[in-house]
Amino acid sequence: MAKKSAVARENKRRRLVEANYKKRSELRNIAKSLTASEEEKENARVALNKMRRDTAHIRLHNRCLLTGRPRGYLRKFAISRICFREMASMGEIPGVIKASW
């Protein structure tokens, strides 16, 4: 099990990213725009720099929904490899069977 504080911090970051995604993407588009003036681009960059770091989606880290484990994450199932193996062997994941050939 991961520390509860680490999981809580990650959840907080996810909420911040969702809340600020639209504003951040608009500012990024202005900063990258070919038609915007240099002053507008500079203002957009300054506004982006003033925003909290945790509002950037790049700071998110995938964690297992069950244990909070940050490594060995399987995106398709949103759980770690260890939880996946346990659940698959117990038949708790529909459509997943042990391979045999």
Swiss-Prot record:
One of its GO terms (biological process) is translation. InterPro entries: Ribosomal_uS14, Ribosomal_uS14_bac/plastid, Ribosomal_uS14_CS. Gene3D superfamilies: 1.10.287.1480. Keywords: Ribonucleoprotein, Ribosomal protein, RNA-binding, rRNA-binding. It holds the Pfam family Ribosomal_S14. One of its GO terms (molecular function) is rRNA binding. Disulfide bonds: none annotated. One of its GO terms (cellular component) is cytoplasm. Part of the 30S ribosomal subunit. Contacts proteins S3 and S10. Binds 16S rRNA, required for the assembly of 30S particles and may also be responsible for determining the conformation of the 16S rRNA at the A site. NCBIfam families: PRK08881.1. Belongs to the universal ribosomal protein uS14 family. HAMAP family: Ribosomal_uS14_1. This is Small ribosomal subunit protein uS14.
